[in-house]
């Protein structure tokens, strides 16, 4: 399993999420996943909502174009980003 893969125009990200971090950032590769730190706590879906908001800004896509395929309730997630307009350098290096 790769941390990042392309499916036609879409990106598939396998993520490890670190909630309650000091700042939002893409940390780097963590095993076979991409580690992302977010400031939101893992309570009542706040971390998922914050993650989608952060990714929408990073990839310049509407929030509706980011889909959590697996891991709705855990730290290990599989995310699909539909037709990203921008790919951050750290992720582009993994493609």
UniProtKB/Swiss-Prot annotation:
It holds the Pfam family DUF167. InterPro entries: DUF167 (IPR003746), YggU-like_sf (IPR036591). GO terms for cellular component: cytoplasm. Belongs to the UPF0235 family. This is UPF0235 protein Ssed_1229.
């Amino acid at each position: 399993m790769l941390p990042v893969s392309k499916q036609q125009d879409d990106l598939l990200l396998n993520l490890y999420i670190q909630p309650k971090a000091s700042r939002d950032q893409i940390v780097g590769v963590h095993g076979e996943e991409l580690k992302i730190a977010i400031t939101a706590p893992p309570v009542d879906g706040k971390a998922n909502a914050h993650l989608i908001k952060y990714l929408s800004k990073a990839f310049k896509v509407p929030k509706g174009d980011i889909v959590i395929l697996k891991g709705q309730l855990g730290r290990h997630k599989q995310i699909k980003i539909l037709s990203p307009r921008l790919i951050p350098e750290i992720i582009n290096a993994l493609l």
